[in-house]
Each structure stands twice: as structure tokens, then as C-alpha cells.
Amino acid sequence: MIRITGGKFKQKKLASINDFVRPTSSLKREAFFSIIESYAIKNSIELYKNKIFLDLFAGIGTMGLEAISRGMSEVIFFENNIEVLEILKKNCLSICKNNQFKIYEEDLIHSKLEIEFKNISNFSIFSFFKFKN
């Protein structure tokens, strides 16, 4: 069973599908958020308020929903697997308010979708995936 590891919805169970989906492990999620939270504290940065988290290969939404649980304002999910999308929507509706998430049914790598982000001074991209050049 997959659970949220921290924040407001700590221990909340997430629906999953099958062995095809490999959610980010709880250890990796805890490590990721611990690192960025430590960085934010050290540099006096407001980490979550009025911020958007991009879950680029969302699967069932573990990373994005973890971000919402910890106080992120909004999550944008990208997922293109039809079976997984239904589980992702179910998980989002069990945790998020309707205005806290958007789901794009797209393959991000081949997408022609353009998203406009205003007033972004810096950003980071984090992925457990290895890409071939």
C-alpha cells in the first residue's frame, strides 16, 4: 500500500493499479522533500506558499500529492497512460481541492502543449528517470 509520508495528509493511502506503475518510493519522497525543505530554511525561502509543483511523469501522483500534503498551492500532473489516469484522478480527488490540480493527458516528451509560467525567477527539475540522448 502506498501512503503519503508527510504533511497534512500523512499516512493517507493512495490507490494503485498494478506492477506496470512504479510509484516513487516513500524513502525517495522523504529524502527529496527533506533536501528541498532544508535548502529553503537555510536560504530563507518560502517553499510552498503560492507555488506550483510539476509532476511530469505522474503515474498515480505520489510526488505531486506529497507536495500538496506538505503545503504546495497547486500541482500540474502529466500522464498519458489511460488506465493510470483514472487512478490519478481518483487520488487527486481524495486529497486535493478542485482548484489545486490540473491533469494533462499528454506524453510530456512528445507534447506540443505550451504552458505559460509568469514571474518564474528560477526552477529545478527533479527526476528518477534516466533519459537517453
Regions found by a protein language model. Give the residues of each.
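A short SAM/SAH-binding and catalytic strip from SAM-dependent methyltransferases
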Residues: F123-N133
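Anionic group-transfer/hydrolysis microenvironments
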Residues: F57, N81, K130
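Conserved SAM-binding motif I beta-strand of class I
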Residues: E74-E79
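A generic structural signal for alpha->beta connector loops
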Residues: N50, M72, N98-Q100
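S-adenosyl-L-methionine
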Residues: M1-L65, S69-R70, N80, L85-S121
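Conserved acidic residues
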Residues: K51, S73, S121-S124
